[in-house]
Amino acid sequence: MSAKNYDVVIMGAGHNGLVAATYLAKAGKSVLILEANDEIGGATQSVQAFPGFDARVSRYSYLVALLPDKIIKDLQLTFETISRDVSSFTPYSTTSGENEGLYVSRNWDSKTEESFKEIDPTGNEGRAWQDFYAEVAEFAHKIAPTLLQPLQTRSQLREQINLPKVWKYLIEDPIGEVICERFKSDIVRGVVLTDALIGTFASAYDLQANICFLYHLIGNGTGEWKVPRGGMGALVNELVRVATESGVEIRTNQKVVAIESTSDYVKVKTSSGDEFIASHFLSNAAPGVLAEIRGKKKPESLDGAQLKINILLKRLPQLKSGIDPQLAFAGTFHANESFTQCEVTYNEAKGGKMPTKLPIEMYCHTLTDPSILSPELSAAGFHTLTLFALHTPASLFDKDNDAARAAALESAFASLNEYLVEPIQDVIAAIEIKTPLDLEEAIALPRGNIFHKDLQFPFREDGSQPSWGVETDDPRIFICGAGATRGGGVSGIPGHNAAMAVLGSN
C-alpha cells in the first residue's frame, strides 16, 4: 500500500490538535489528524461516566480560563462559557470550635467583605486581598496578548509589562514567601496558594509553584475560570465542526507507532499498518510519548499529583456552617487547604505517605449549567460534583494502585465530611475515581501529569534562539499540545502557536 501525502499530519485529536489543524487548513494546508482512541477530544471529552444515569460529565478537564477570545473569533467557534457569581467558599473551624466559612464572590461585594472581617475584624486581610489581585490582574492584562506571539526573552517581557514589583513576586521570589508576606491568615494564604498547586507536586517555596500560579491567573487577561455550557465536550464538538468544514481529515483508532524523518518529509506509521507522508508532523501527545515513538530519551518531569473524582449526587449535602449549599458549591469549594495543611501534606506525600486528610477542592457544574443532566435527573434534584485532591503523586500509587486509590478516596472524603452535616457518601448516586496512573492508562498522560511535563515560564531566556515554544530538535516536528511552552490547561494556545510555527517555516 502506498503512503498517502499531506502537508501536515497531527498525532492526537485533543483540543489543541484540533485548533492547530483548523488554523493550518484555513491557510490552505492539507491536514490529517490521527487519534489513537475511538473518542475525539482527549482530556477535553465529555462522557456518560455513570452507567444507568443520563449525565454527560467533563471527565478530565472542567473549567475554562486560558482559551483566548482571539482563537474563538479566528476559528468562528460557537462556544459559550458562563461566569460563576461565586468565586470560592472555604469552610473552617474557629479556635472556639465554631463552623464558619470564607466566602469570596467573583466581584468584591459586601458579603465578601463581611466574610473577610470574620477572619480579620480590622479589614486589613480583605484590603490585602483586593490589592494583591488588582496587581495580578494588571499583570495578566499585559501578558495575555503575548501568549499568541513568538516567545519574548525574559528581559523583553519584563520591560514590556513594566510592573517591576509584580514581576519580582510572581517570577523571581518563591510564591510561598510572597503569600506569607502579603497575608496573615493561614486560611486566606491557603486559598491563594492553591492556584500554585493544581496538578503540580511542589512546595509553596518552589518556583514550579510560581509558574503554576501564573498560568492559573493570566487566562484571557482576566484569570476568570468559567463553566463551559454543555460541558467541555461542547468545545470539542465545535472544534470538530470547524476542523472538518475547513477540510481537516480525522481518523480514529490510529495509534502512531513510528516516525521517520528526513530532510524532505516525515513518514508516519500507525498500529493498523497505514503509512502517511507529510512535510510537517505535529504532536498533540506529551513530549515523553513523542520521544518514546522517536526512540529518544524522555524529558524528566514531576509526577502527576492529583486525584480526580467525578460524582453524581442525589442532592447537595448540607454544611455545618449553615451556608446554603447552592452558594457553597457554586464556586470552588476548598477543604483542608490552609497554607500549613498544604505544606504538611506535601511533605507527607514526598516522604511516601498517603496524607490522612488530603487538601481538596471541587465545584458543582450543574449549579451553573444543568444542561449536562437529563431533565429527569435535574427535576429530581441531582447534581454533579467534581473533586480534585492535591498532593497525591503517582509514586504513592505505584505499589498497589487499587489499594492506594481506596485510601486516597477515604482521605479525600475525610477532608470533605469534616464540614458536612452528613457524610457525602449518603448522597452519592454514582462515582468515578481516577488516580495519576489511571490518567496515564486512559489518556497517555505521563505519570498522570495533566500538563504533560513541567510547566515553564511564558518567555525564553535571554540569548536563546527565537521560537514559538513548540519546536523540537527536528525542524519538521513540532509540539502542539500541553507540553509546549505556554501549554497546559484548556487553551488552544499551543495549537495556535504550532500552526503559526509551521506556516512561518514555509
What are these regions (language model features)?
Residues 98-207:
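Rossmann-like flavin
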Residues 185, 189-202, 355-363, 422-485:
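A glycine-rich dinucleotide-binding beta-alpha-beta segment and adjacent secondary-structure elements
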Residues 215-265:
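Helical element adjacent to the flavin cofactor pocket in flavoenzyme catalytic cores
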Residues 255-377:
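Mid-domain catalytic core of redox enzymes
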